[in-house]
């Protein structure tokens, strides 16, 4: 079932973030960065969905330059989506990037949403 169809059937508009796999790591989800603009423009045409922004998880490396590069690329991608002027893309303003370990880098690169679970709840206990 398409989420767009479900939202329309319920008479609601659902805000969505498009996840982009900026690190290219196979352990992470998200679309290929090369397709992010086209996918965002497609989402912008779907009834019942409002593209509110993009999200990514930073590269799992110790090299801060590499981490920042992914965040910077996502910000530039968001800016290109907004500049495209395509219908339904003007609401794409949020950048959800950065977690406890890299939130300062993400904020420096323009993040508007950070996910700080470990800083609040501590390390996960894996069973």
Language model: regions and residue ranges:
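Helix C-cap/alpha-to-beta connector motif
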Residues: 6-14
């Amino acid at each position: 079932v398409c989420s767009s169809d479900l939202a329309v059937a319920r008479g609601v508009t659902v805000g969505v973030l498009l996840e982009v796999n900026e690190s290219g790591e196979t352990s992470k989800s998200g679309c290929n960065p090369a397709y992010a603009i086209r996918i965002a423009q497609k989402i912008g045409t779907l009834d019942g969905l409002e593209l509110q922004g993009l999200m990514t998880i930073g590269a799992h490396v110790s090299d801060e330059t590499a981490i920042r590069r992914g965040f910077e690329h996502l910000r530039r991608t968001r800016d290109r989506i907004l500049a495209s002027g395509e219908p339904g893309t003007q609401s794409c303003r949020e950048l959800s990037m950065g977690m406890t370990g890299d939130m300062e880098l993400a904020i420096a690169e323009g993040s508007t949403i950070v996910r700080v679970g470990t800083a609040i709840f501590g390390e996960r206990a894996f069973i």
